[in-house]
Amino acid sequence: MIDQFEFRKNLVLQELENNKIPFSFDAIIGRGGLVKPIPGGVYEVNEAMKRDTVHAMRTHACNLGGLIASKLASTLPNCPAFIADPGVVDELEDIARITGSPLMPKITIWHALNQKAIARRFAKEQGTQYESLDLIICHLGGGISVAVHHHGRAIDANNALDGEGPFSPERAGTLPAGQLIDLCFSGQLTKDELKKRISG
């Protein structure tokens, strides 16, 4: 995915040009990548974050967001680059980390940016604060994430990137474990082919 950096950066610049938006900004924000798990919030892009993004634990186009924002911001005077609520936001309660096997601790990669934005919008429409609400929010797209939001924190969410939870146009969803094990050792698919079938 990193090899698409220039291509995607140029798409951003082309979009600005097509819409006659001058390249003059006080700050630039990009979609956060799959860095180490962090609480929700806004983060300034720094060298450590860029290293984590280049060597991210998973491959996804979102890994380019902070890098592109940083590159574009570096061409302007006093212009910082940020990310907000990346997909690795981890605010899970301890009980939500329990799985049926100690060999597979729960990780969560979900649509945090979208879900938290919707939660804040809903709270505003209700005349209250996100931090005072209990919500269940679903992101329905190429992948599906479902999260429990409690007083401004997502205390449980599925790993949408790896296909956990409901199936969707680009994810197989949670599959029967026994059948999946049989498929893994059947010789029908390589590891990479199987991963592509689960999270295309």
Enumerate the language-model features and the residues they cover.
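Non-catalytic beta/alpha edge segments that cap or flank active sites
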Residues: 1, 17-18, 22-23, 34-35, ...
